[in-house]
Amino acid sequence: MLGTDRCVVEEWLSEFKALPDTQITSYAATLHRKKTLVPALYKVIQDSNNELLEPVCHQLFELYRSSEVRLKRFTLQFLPELMWVYLRLTVSRDRQSNGCIEALLLGIYNLEIADKDGNNKVLSFTIPSLSKPSIYHEPSTIGSMALTEGALCQHDLIRVVYSDLHPQRETFTAQNRFEVLSFLMLCYNSAIVYMPASSYQSLCRMGSRVCVSGFPRQHEKHWKELCGRIVLDPEFMVQLLTGVYYAMYNGQWDLGQEVLDDIIYRAQLELFSQPLLVANAMKNSLPFDAPDSTQEGQKVLKVEVTPTVPRISRTAITTASIRRHRWRREGAEGVNGGEESVNLNDADEGFSSGASLSSQPIGTKPSSSSQRGSLRKVATGRSAKDKETASAIKSSESPRDSVVRKQYVQQPTDLSVDSVELTPMKKHLSLPAGQVVPKTNSLSLIRTASASSSKSFDYVNGSQASTSIGVGTEGGTNLAANNANRYSTVSLQEDRLGQAGEGKELLSPGAPLTKQSRSPSFNMQLISQV
């Protein structure tokens, strides 16, 4: 210790002893202006053999027990360094040099657990709401709470928990050591916003040293003195992380990251779950770059979190909204394309849309009448075109195609748009013009149309352009030219049935549906309007 530092400390000791009680407030206001005093006091505390250590500890205790808050904070800034020296001396079994620091720590503890009347304090803690972001979670990952009567009753409810009573301690033991130190760290964290930068640096150095001392990682540090392994408590490490987290965002970014890694290293070795949870949450929430510390006197945490108010508007998606969107889309297609076919509505994903024609809005009825008019107008020209296409395809048909064609033509092909409503599952169908369905015998119509529509999607041939419900006449003509020998599962089943008996129908009007008569990838219902 230099002579100048010693003179500064001795002057400070004599000045406070001669200070009257009326000037304590003014003395506390000017104490922070002494720039050389704080570094000199750190040197005295770090040297356990210094003769000024005992009077300095006594002076710090007198400042803390005074009624002036600023004098208490002046003593609190040395608390991390005092803890490190105490733990280091405890491991080295140097009880004689450790007596004054131990008395100072116990004195601060006994002052904090009791009020002015000597009664024990009960500390209260407010449980934060999950709707606000923290280092553990983001509120966007939690679903919105239902607006119920119970939720409204608990809207302004503040949940508070209370700590147990802390008994007074006369001396340190192995059982109560970290109980006292954890409570002292709690007191330090409650006033950490008033601490200077030198106190933050001392906190980070203390946290790193107590975690890696006695472990192989200690040799990677550039410390002058080595220390034995220090026993730690999970609660003390959590309180240490609380102070380190604030110091990282207020000028100690590099030191804070170093001590954070050291705490995770020690917590993994000791299998402490609570420090691991807090430390990993802190590490995952850190930004990539150091926060802006150009502003002097800034005492806030700058953490980038997800906003509580969602920026993306979430509109409820219901069956009605899907139908409205589909009707608008089909109306636009009917106006632009002028097709003569009837587009069937897609089934809502996740919903069952088996509504009848009477449940449709009035605005869709004119579109149905316009479609019927377009069917009548184009029927004559379409039938002539179909005859030419059928004659061209018939010449290139194979014997197998003709067999399947005979069975396929036997199905009723007269479908009427006026009497049915089609509700397929994820497919678009189109009815060629000129197909009429009688309004009676609705049950056989459902069964027959289900089978025929299944075959029309699986069996791709040129004959489907004029004889069945297909994907479209023009598309069927192109597919017939390129894929004349393409068969699906249903067409192969029909071929086997045709070889067993050509004159036998695939499905009779009164026969029940079987697994072979249904397409595995498509389902359609035709509901007759009564």
From Swiss-Prot:
This is Hyccin 2. InterPro entries: Hyccin. Residues 328-410, 498-530 are annotated as: Disordered. The modification Phosphothreonine is found at residues 30, 306. The keyword Cell membrane applies. One of its GO terms (cellular component) is cytosol. Keywords: Cell membrane, Cytoplasm, Membrane, Phosphoprotein. The modification Phosphoserine is found at residues 321, 341, 430, 442, 444, 491. It comes from the Eukaryota. Residues 353-373, 514-530 have a biased composition (Polar residues). The keyword Cell membrane applies. One of its GO terms (biological process) is phosphatidylinositol phosphate biosynthetic process. Component of a phosphatidylinositol 4-kinase (PI4K) complex, composed of PI4KA, EFR3 (EFR3A or EFR3B), TTC7 (TTC7A or TTC7B) and HYCC (HYCC1 or HYCC2). The gene is HYCC2. Component of a complex required to localize phosphatidylinositol 4-kinase (PI4K) to the plasma membrane.
